């Protein structure tokens, strides 16, 4: 049971980390170039 609990917590933390990293790169892209803002809308749809 302890293994399962750790696995779930680890996966949750990993998901939050990757989501934060994705947000960070997204924000960096927006700040980086003005013309790239239009391109950012496509992957989200």
From Swiss-Prot:
BP GO terms, sorted: adenylate cyclase-activating G protein-coupled receptor signaling pathway; neuron projection development; neuropeptide signaling pathway; positive regulation of ERK1 and ERK2 cascade; regulation of protein localization
A GO molecular-function annotation: neuropeptide hormone activity
User: Which Gene Ontology cellular component annotation is one that this UniProt entry carries?
Assistant: perikaryon
Report the InterPro entries cross-referenced here: Glucagon_GIP_secretin_VIP, VIP/GHRH-like
Offer one Pfam family short name for this entry.
Hormone_2
Alphabetical list of PROSITE patterns matching this protein: GLUCAGON
Respond yes or no to whether keyword Oxidoreductase is given for this record: no
Which positions are tagged coiled coil? Answer: none
**Keywords, A to Z?**
Secreted
**Where is the protein situated, by its record's location annotation?**
Secreted
Report which superkingdom the organism of origin falls in: Eukaryota
Q: Describe the family membership recorded for this protein in Swiss-Prot or TrEMBL.
A: Belongs to the glucagon family.
- Family matches, as PANTHER family: GLUCAGON-FAMILY NEUROPEPTIDE, PITUITARY ADENYLATE CYCLASE-ACTIVATING POLYPEPTIDE
Q: Please describe what this protein does.
A: GRF is released by the hypothalamus and acts on the adenohypophyse to stimulate the secretion of growth hormone.
Supply the name of the protein.
Answer: Somatoliberin
């Amino acid at each position: 049971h302890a293994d399962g609990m750790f696995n779930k917590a680890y996966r949750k933390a990993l998901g939050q980390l990757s989501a934060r990293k994705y947000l960070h790169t997204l924000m960096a892209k927006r700040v980086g170039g003005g013309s790239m803002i239009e391109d950012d809308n496509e992957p989200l749809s």
